[in-house]
Amino acid sequence: MTQTAHPDTVLIVDFGSQVTQLIARRVREAGVYCEIVPFQSAEEGFKRLKPKAVILSGSPASTLDIGSPRAPSVIFESGLPVFGICYGQQTMCAQLGGKVESGHHREFGRAFLEVEKDCALFDGLWSLGSRHQVWMSHGDRVTALPEGFEVVATSSNAPFAFIADETRKYYAVQFHPEVVHTPDGAKLISNFVHKIAGIKGDWTMSAYRAKAVEAIRKQVGGKKVICALSGGVDSSVAALLIHEAVGDQLTCILVDHGLMRKDEAANVVAMFQEHYNLHLLHIDASDRFIGELEGVSDPETKRKIIGRLFIEVFEEEAKKLGGADFLAQGTLYPDVIESVSFTGGPSVTIKSHHNVGGLPERMNMQLVEPLRELFKDEVRVLGRELGLPESFIGRHPFPGPGLAIRCPGGISREKLEILREADAIYLDEIRKAGLYDAIWQAFAVLLPVQTVGVMGDGRTYEFVCALRAVTSVDGMTADFYHYDMEFLGRAATRIINEVRGINRVVYDVTSKPPGTIEWE
C-alpha cells in the first residue's frame, strides 16, 4: 500500500538507539503521526515528510568520536521545534556551539531531577522545586551550553540534565523520557508535540481506516488480491481492511503449515465463516512444510524455508484461481523500519522477520501491506474499529514460523504434536486462573533434551518442556511473569500426566534483555 500523506508529522531521527521505536510509540499515543528515519537519510526524510517538529534519538555512539552521527543542518535551519534525547542532546549541543565531554561518572538506571526553572514543556506537569524520577543511560555529558540555552532541571550526576532554548523551541534531556521507567516521560513528549509544536492529536485509527481503504482501492484498482491469512491479529485486520476496500476481489488463503497451535486453523476458519462474508480457502500444506523442515535445527534456516514455502503455495493457489496480481501481508511498522548502525556498517541481525527475511527477491505478485505504518497496539485498536471480537483481538502474539521456533533443534511430527498438547494445557490453565489478559505472551517450548524420570514402576527417558510467560507494554522489553508456585505445580503436573513424551517441566525466568521472548 502506498503510504498516505500526513500533514502533521513528527520526524524522529534515529542515531541507533535500541529504544527509538518507543519514542515513536509515545508520539503516536499522543495522537500524532510520526516516522523514524535513520540519520544517514534524515535530510531526505526531512524534505519528504515536511514535519512540524523533530525529535533526535539516543545512540550508543559518542559525539567525541571522529565521524560520529550528526543531525542534518537543515533541521536547525528550519525554525522548527527540536527535542534532543540523550545522544540527541549531546549532538544538538555539539552542533550548536556547546561542549560535550566524556563523563567521569557513567550514569545508568534510575535518577532524580530537581526542577530549577519553569519551562513551557513542564506545563501542567512539573513545578519549580519539584523532584521527579527519570531513567539515565549515558557516559558522555554536556559541559557547556550553546548560546541561548539555559538549565531547567538537574540531577546529582548531570548538571545539564534538562536544558532549553525557549526562543527557538529547542529542548534537550540527558535521560530517556520514552521508557516506562521515566513515569512522566510520555507526558513530556505529549507536551512537546502538542503545546510546543502545536500539532493536533488527530491521528486516530478511525481516520487511518478511511485513508487506508482509499489507498488500497487506488493501488489495487480492479485486480485480484490474495491475503496471507495466518490466523493472527495482524493478518486478520489486514484482511478485513482490504475486504472493506475491494470486496470480492479479495481471496483469503489460510495455509495450515502444521505449525499452528492446537485446533487453531479450524477455529480461525469457523470465526471468519460465521462473522464475515470473506472468500476463504483453507489449504492443508503440512506435509510439504514438515517434510522440508524435518531434521532442520538452525533457526534462521527454518525461517527461510517457511518463508519460501509460503510464497510458493500462494503463487500456486493464485494460478488455480486464475491469477492474482497482489499478495497482502500483515507487515507492521517495526518490521520495515530500517535498522541503523552508527558506524555506517551493517547492523547486527538478531533474527529474520518471517514477513521480510523469508521473501524471495523475485516474486510474481506485488505486495499490499495496509498495516505497514502501524504498531501492534494500533492494529488492535483498528481491529476493534473493524468489528473483530475482543477475544480474538486480545490473543497473545504468535510468530509466523509457529511452533517450528518453539521446538529448538531438529523438528519432527512427533515433537510438534507433543509441544502442541503441552502448549494447549498450559494456556488452558492460564485461562482457568484468570491470568490470560495479565500476561503479554505465554507458550510452551519443547527442549531438545531428554531426562530420566520415574512414572509408575518404571523409568522414563523423555523430553523437557519449558514454560514461558512475560509481561510487557510493547514486546521490546519484557519481564518474566511472577506466577505463584501453586499455579506452576498444577500446570506442570497436568502436562506430565497428560502428554506422553514429557517427564520434566521447567519455568523460564529470563527477562528481555538479555534474553528474547521467543527461544529462537
Curated annotation (Swiss-Prot):
ATP binds at S230, G231, G232, V233, D234, S235, S236. Its EC number is 6.3.5.2. PROSITE patterns: GATASE_TYPE_1, GMPS_ATP_PPASE. It catalyses: XMP + L-glutamine + ATP + H2O = GMP + L-glutamate + AMP + diphosphate + 2 H(+). The keyword Mitochondrion does not apply. One of its GO terms (cellular component) is cytosol. Pfam families: GATase, GMP_synt_C, NAD_synthase. Keywords: ATP-binding, Glutamine amidotransferase, GMP biosynthesis, Ligase, Nucleotide-binding, Purine biosynthesis. Residues 203-395 form the GMPS ATP-PPase domain. NCBIfam families: guaA_Cterm, guaA_Nterm, PRK00074.1. Catalyzes the synthesis of GMP from XMP. This is GMP synthase [glutamine-hydrolyzing]. It comes from Sinorhizobium fredii (strain NBRC 101917 / NGR234). The gene is guaA.
